[in-house]
Amino acid sequence: MTGKPDISSFEDLEVFQRAYRVPLDLHRASLQLTKIEQRGLADQIRRASKSICGNIAEGFGKQRRSSAEFKRFLLMASGSADEMQVWLKYCSDLDYIDRNACEHWRDEYRQIARMLQGLYTSGARALLITDY
């Protein structure tokens, strides 16, 4: 045993699993926004929330060549998690989505950002795949 975590896919990462679950409910809630916001705020919420998982997956795939590439994509995912906090604040302040739900999701994205930062600073090198 090498001491490395048993992670063979981006889907094995806890941060990916969490970042995948949150947008499912958020997507449904965004569909309830006004028609005028469907092409603006709602669309941005759907894209930014899903880009977190996309960046984790893309970075994980590129880590075979470079841990620096993986880390770069983790930074982009973290940026999207921070961006989501802004969009959710707008939804709350404009009374588009229940304030308690928005605060819950903002907490989730804060936690996801912390997890991504932790992976960036300590775990990205440990996950580097060398056995293929």
Predicted regions and their residues:
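Amphipathic alpha-helical assembly/interaction segments
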Residues: 1-132
